[in-house]
Regions:
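Nucleotide-sugar donor-binding catalytic core of glycosyltransferases
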Residues: 2-29, 35-46, 62-74, 91-93, ...
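Short amphipathic alpha-helix with an adjacent loop that forms part of the alpha/beta core around
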Residues: 46-54, 323-324
């Protein structure tokens, strides 16, 4: 079966890693997967196609309005692919009533110019199959499909036992104590809490790096429009000596994150409310680091399994990090068991099987 993925790609954000994995794993399973459009410098290694008739399904991977192609390309898709063979993966919960979580919204007209009803009617005009990467969709008729996944072949360093992992981790001389890779959009409420909480153990932990857009200062566009969500505390960042780096390309994230002892898994408030997963939910476990889970406890159990509870940072950030540094074998045991769980329950081959079942239903 052949799949045409429709989305605007960015080499350091959104679903580009996941799309690359669907192309790779799809070919291994006998499926052709390509991105609709002409080749882009954002992901030049991926296959692209404008030949709509060669594909069985068009799958729209939607974060923003610009993920829908401009005319005449959108018209070609709608005319050339029957509606029952068009699918939308709603990665930001747009196909809901307007939801606010802290100062995070699924509809923000000041930024994209679209009201909530426009998103709902627009989705329904394109497809009758709307999927969201959550186990618990709010809107009737939406199907749960996690979309993102885990590929054990991408694990940066394999270990046979927690003791081996802990010994190498402790002696590795990593460049950073902690690295977070992701843009400064609706992340500061959690990043700020994490940084404030770890301050008592900052010297023991080591250097901290935030890699992505707008970690050096609040962007001018957010100031001018009065939009919350790209906030930060310059004094806190300066006091902790936090390094801000430019965005990391999707195929270098695991390698870069492996340079740190720890890496937090952080979802924006809206995603926590909707229990939505992202590519980092899974791919962080590919890096040679101890993931720190800053997610709702029920979501940790549902996605990662009970063994991952040990990696939840909880309310005592400094105490948790101190214990992780003092007893790394305990936490590497949780990491290795969680990797095994992800490989069994959330592989991309399993995602393909789930997607095929939805399409054929």
């Amino acid at each position: 079966m052949n799949f045409l993925l429709v989305s605007r790609l960015s080499q350091s954000a959104r679903s580009v890693y996941t799309i690359a994995k669907y192309v790779e794993v799809g070919a291994e399973l006998g499926h052709e997967v390509a991105v609709f459009g002409e080749k882009t410098s954002e992901a030049p290694c991926l296959p692209y196609s404008l030949d709509i008739r060669s594909f069985d399904y068009a799958i729209f991977v939607v974060y923003e309005s610009w993920d829908f192609p401009d005319m005449p390309y959108l018209a070609q898709l709608l005319d050339g692919v029957p509606k029952e063979r068009r699918v939308i993966i709603d990665c930001c919960g747009r196909y809901n009533d307007t939801i606010r979580a802290e100062h995070d919204f699924n509809h923000l007209e000041r930024m994209d110019g679209h009201q909530g009803w426009e998103w709902v009617e627009g989705f329904e005009a394109v497809s009758t199959k709307i999927l969201q990467p959550t186990l618990t969709p709010l809107r009737p008729g939406v199907r749960p499909f996690l979309w993102h996944g885990f590929d054990p072949r991408d694990v940066a360093r394999e270990y046979t036992a927690a003791q081996q992992a802990a010994q190498i981790w402790a002696a590795d001389g990593k460049s950073y104590g902690m690295v977070y890779v992701g843009h400064n959009w609706q992340r500061w409420s959690q990043v700020g809490r994490l940084l404030e909480g770890l301050e008592p153990v900052r010297e023991q932990l080591g250097s901290i790096c935030l890699a992505g857009c707008d970690w050096d200062k609040r962007p001018e566009w957010a100031i001018q429009q009065g939009i919350k969500g790209a906030d930060l505390d310059p004094e806190l960042l300066k006091r902790l000596g936090v390094e801000a780096k430019l965005p990391i390309p999707y195929d270098k994230v695991a390698e870069f994150t492996s340079r740190a002892r720890f890496s937090p898994v952080i979802h924006r408030p809206l995603f926590n409310h909707l229990r939505m997963v992202t590519n980092r939910t899974f791919s962080t476990f590919c890096a040679d680091t101890i993931p720190i889970l800053m997610l709702p406890e029920d979501m940790i159990r549902a996605v990662y399994g009970p063994q991952a509870q040990a990696l939840s940072v909880g309310d005592d950030v400094a105490g948790k990090l101190s214990d992780m540094m003092r007893r790394p074998e305990v936490y590497w045991d949780a990491v290795l068991k969680t990797r095994a769980h992800l490989a069994e329950r959330h592989s991309f081959s399993r995602r393909f099987a789930e997607l095929m079942a939805i399409l054929e239903s």
